[in-house]
């Protein structure tokens, strides 16, 4: 029997299931089984993790800039991000191996479902002139990566304490074997893909 740490379940009622996860179980799984003809429920693609990455190239010149990225990702994802460091020294960019050049957080479990729910229902609709996500940014194995130009569309980021606008990359890792399966999964979950 596994137990979860009390700090992770604080403020949640017993038996709590995130809204998007519940929707996945009740609506998306039957729809995908019908669409692709899966015989077993375990064959249906699901979400594994979401990686939020914020590259801060200017941190090579000013080390304090990385703190803003760490603060923003922590507010958006609800967990402390890891610092990405340079692997090689590149003289043209005034970069030395080991310098902090970005921050990233890997979100799994219920936090992942809650993050995606907030992103799809609150953050993406706040983007000005938003025409939808590109349906072509799959990696060949059902995983989807897209970029956002600024972090202010998330309600968790305090706009008064914002030092600068930072873009971010978000990767959604799935168990889908093909891009078509991954695209169908994300479309059923509510990802607003553009029609070509």
Curated annotation (Swiss-Prot):
InterPro entries: Ribosomal_uL5, Ribosomal_uL5_bac-type, Ribosomal_uL5_C, Ribosomal_uL5_dom_sf, Ribosomal_uL5_N
Keyword tags: Ribonucleoprotein, Ribosomal protein, RNA-binding, rRNA-binding, tRNA-binding
GO cellular component, one term: ribosome
Keyword rRNA-binding carried by entry: yes
GO BP terms: translation
Keyword match RNA-binding: yes
GO molecular function ontology, one term from the record: structural constituent of ribosome
A Pfam family of this chain: Ribosomal_L5
Function: This is one of the proteins that bind and probably mediate the attachment of the 5S RNA into the large ribosomal subunit, where it forms part of the central protuberance. In the 70S ribosome it contacts protein S13 of the 30S subunit (bridge B1b), connecting the 2 subunits; this bridge is implicated in subunit movement. Contacts the P site tRNA; the 5S rRNA and some of its associated proteins might help stabilize positioning of ribosome-bound tRNAs.
Family: Belongs to the universal ribosomal protein uL5 family.
Oligomeric form and interacting partners: Part of the 50S ribosomal subunit; part of the 5S rRNA/L5/L18/L25 subcomplex. Contacts the 5S rRNA and the P site tRNA. Forms a bridge to the 30S subunit in the 70S ribosome.
Record's protein name: Large ribosomal subunit protein uL5
Organism in which the protein naturally occurs: Acidothermus cellulolyticus (strain ATCC 43068 / DSM 8971 / 11B)
């Amino acid at each position: 029997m596994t137990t979860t740490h009390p700090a992770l379940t604080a403020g949640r009622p017993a038996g709590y299931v995130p809204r998007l996860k519940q929707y996945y179980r009740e609506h998306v799984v039957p729809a995908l089984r019908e669409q692709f003809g899966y015989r077993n429920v375990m064959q249906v693609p699901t979400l594994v993790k979401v990686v939020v990455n914020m590259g801060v190239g200017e941190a090579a010149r000013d080390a304090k800039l990385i703190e803003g990225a760490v603060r923003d990702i922590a507010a958006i994802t609800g967990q402390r991000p890891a610092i990405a460091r340079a692997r090689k020294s590149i003289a043209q960019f005034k970069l030395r191996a080991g310098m902090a050049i970005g921050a990233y957080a890997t979100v799994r479990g219920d936090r992942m479902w809650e993050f995606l729910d907030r992103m799809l229902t609150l953050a993406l609709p706040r983007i000005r002139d938003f025409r939808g996500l590109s349906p072509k940014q799959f990696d060949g194995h059902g995983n989807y990566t897209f970029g956002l130009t600024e972090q202010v569309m998330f309600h968790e980021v305090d706009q008064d304490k914002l030092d600068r606008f930072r873009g971010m990359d978000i990767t959604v890792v799935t168990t889908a074997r093909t891009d078509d399966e991954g695209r169908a999964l994300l479309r059923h979950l509510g990802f607003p893909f553009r029609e070509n």
